[in-house]
Amino acid sequence: MRKKVMAAVLTAAMVASVSAMPQMVAAADDEFKIGLITDVGGVNDGSFNQSAWEGLEKAGEELGVEVNYLESATDADYQPNMETFVDEDYDLIISVGYMLADATREAAEANPDTKFAIIDDSSIDLPNVTSLMFKAEQASYLVGYVAGLTTKTNNIGFVVGMTNETMNQFGYGYCAGAIDANPDITVQQ
C-alpha cells in the first residue's frame, strides 16, 4: 500500500515538475532526455528508488520524452553518474534523495545550462535546480488510519530504514492516523 501511494505521489510530482517542458520539447530538434540517478539500492529496491523510476517511466510515456536511469552502488557513484548524464546532454537530471545533494550541487554549479531536480532535499539554492519535496506525513496518515481501523490487537508498528526528517514526518503521520482511527491503539516504533 505504502509503495503504491509513494509511486502515485512521485508520478504526480514528476509529471508536474516537467509539465512546463512541452514547449521546450517542441522547440528542440532532438528528443528531450530525462535521467534519474538512484541512491544506493537501485531501481529494484522495492522502495524509493523503484517508485521514482516507475513514476519517471510513466511520465516519459505520457510526455513522449526519453527517460533513463543510472544506479549508484555506493555514494562514490553519484558524481560519475551526474557526469555521464551531463556528457550525454540530458536536459533534466533527477537525483533520488537528499544523500545526492552534494553531488547535485557540484554538477549544477559546473553545468549551469543543465536542469537538475532533487527529491527530498531543499538545501540547493541555484537557478538550475528544482527541489521536489513531499509531505510524507499526509500519505502515511492514511496508511496509519487504515491500520488503526483494521487491527485486531490494537497493537501495530512500523519500521523505517533510517532516521531523518522525512522518516520522522512519515512516523508522525502514521501515528496520528492510527490514533485518530482507534484511540485505544498502541503504535510500536
List each model region and its residues.
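Short, low-complexity disordered leader/linker segments with a strong preference
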Residues: 1-32
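A residue-level marker of the well-folded mature domains of exported/periplasmic proteins
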Residues: 27-189
